[in-house]
């Protein structure tokens, strides 16, 4: 606790170390007025992008796909795009506040994220080794059980006639999943863990969830490196497609951050949400094609239903980047759906966060 507090004192956002709640709220209002982009121009640009996306959706045509499913995807995409643009227009002032705060506090965010990462393993003999141990043991356990004991790899991953080494297929799914699980768990509890900053200091509490997300990213970078090494060992040398790992990692960070603003705000008032998320993660691991191939599902409707899970896009993307050699724009509808969903969740999350933030200190 002291480490974070000292870092904040060194790089204070407002140059103050204390203040009443009324001063805090006034400071937040003044903070968001600085260097603000013209509202009408921002809304016009957002709607322009939304209309452009809708036009691309309507004009896109895949003659090999089921046309009924294609029309459903087009309609759903246009509706989601219109919904997101409408929410952005109505609640513009509330939605843009947090992105502005994050940008203006980027130096403080980086310092606090590094300090949070170091603090997590301070005092233990093995330190950061513990952060690596559980994921490695989990990968080895699943690999031994499914690949060596049951030898079920063909059924799980060779639905399209191509069977990469199962350990590589498994790691490409588990690496993004481990990051998502760790980041959403830590991000959800950010306000609760740093309650002393919420209550006692003039502090832009909107930076707390992203601090946790960035701290979890350090370990993720290490595991991405291990994943690439394993791929090379099996003969999958890096290609131009491998660069997409950066794109899919950015997708994952934005998606987790969008969810974290919503869950971190709600868990302050509903502590049971932490347990709900824990159970949801257990279910989500099996609902996401990490150990199995979504192509093995018997019907297109079931495949479409599972693809509503945004993590399917990311997990499949990691595999496309490493051994399937596919560009993300080849999955047009999946990419469009993912970003519309993520932006919508970010808008909703920031709205809820802004609506409840004045009550955080009282509850905590």
Regions found by a protein language model. Name each.
Residues 5-11, 19-364:
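Hydrophobic transmembrane alpha-helices and immediately adjacent juxtamembrane helices
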